[in-house]
Amino acid sequence: MGSEVCRVFLIGGRASGKSTVGRALAARLGWDFADTDAMVTRRAGCDIATLVAERGWDAFRDMESDALRDAAARERVVVATGGGMVLRAENRALLREAGVTVFLSLPVEVVAARLARNPEHGQRPSLTGKAVADEVADVMRERAPLYAEAARHVVRGDAPVACIVEDITALLAFS
């Protein structure tokens, strides 16, 4: 692994596997793991749906940015970010500058199927009010250029977790 790498950020849409891959990658590297959504819910004292309903999206995004800054201040950490972390320019800049950022890219159909199978993901507030597959397609179309701007590497997120971890580990060796 490149000697300057001390943080890995995982970005991508909802249900792209950021937390699952992040935990496995952190274990492989012997590093800590941080999840910005978990940091936000811990600080807010409620789940994200409640936070957004009571305080609004701007308050959530502010707390999300704070969580990213806190995670970026740590060393030897793999950070799973919320799907909308890239919406703010300052977050994209921090992701580029503070470590190696990997975009877990998935086909819309795979994300929609994961969301349909996992009730926990269904607890997140809808961004558009549309059907899951339509919302995923719209959100990914909007965010794809932002993920590309923030990421140093793109990895297919629909492979087995162990394969994704191997792919990222190999990329880190050259970062």
Curated annotation (Swiss-Prot):
Keyword Iron-sulfur on entry: no
Family per similarity comment? Belongs to the shikimate kinase family.
Coarse class of the protein's main subcellular location: cytoplasm
Q: Where does this protein hold ATP?
A: 12-19
List the InterPro entries.
P-loop_NTPase, Shikimate/glucono_kinase, Shikimate_kinase/TSH1, Shikimate_kinase_CS
Which catalytic reaction applies to this protein? shikimate + ATP = 3-phosphoshikimate + ADP + H(+)
Name the gene behind this protein: aroK
Q: Record the organism.
A: Nitratidesulfovibrio vulgaris (strain ATCC 29579 / DSM 644 / CCUG 34227 / NCIMB 8303 / VKM B-1760 / Hildenborough) (Desulfovibrio vulgaris)
Task: Tell me the superkingdom of the source.
Answer: Bacteria
Which locations, inside or outside the cell, does it occupy?
Answer: Cytoplasm
Q: Which Gene Ontology BP terms does the record give?
A: amino acid biosynthetic process; aromatic amino acid family biosynthetic process; chorismate biosynthetic process
Q: In which pathway does it act?
A: Metabolic intermediate biosynthesis; chorismate biosynthesis; chorismate from D-erythrose 4-phosphate and phosphoenolpyruvate: step 5/7
Q: Which PANTHER family match?
A: SHIKIMATE KINASE (PTHR21087), SHIKIMATE KINASE 2 (PTHR21087:SF21)
Gene3D superfamilies under this entry? P-loop containing nucleotide triphosphate hydrolases
Keyword entries, A-Z: Amino-acid biosynthesis, Aromatic amino acid biosynthesis, ATP-binding, Cytoplasm, Kinase, Nucleotide-binding, Transferase
For this protein, the Enzyme Commission number is 2.7.1.71
A Gene Ontology cellular component where this protein is annotated is:
cytosol
GO MF term (any one): shikimate kinase activity
Q: Is Lipid metabolism included in the keywords of this UniProt record? A: no
Query: Any idea what this protein is called?
Result: Shikimate kinase
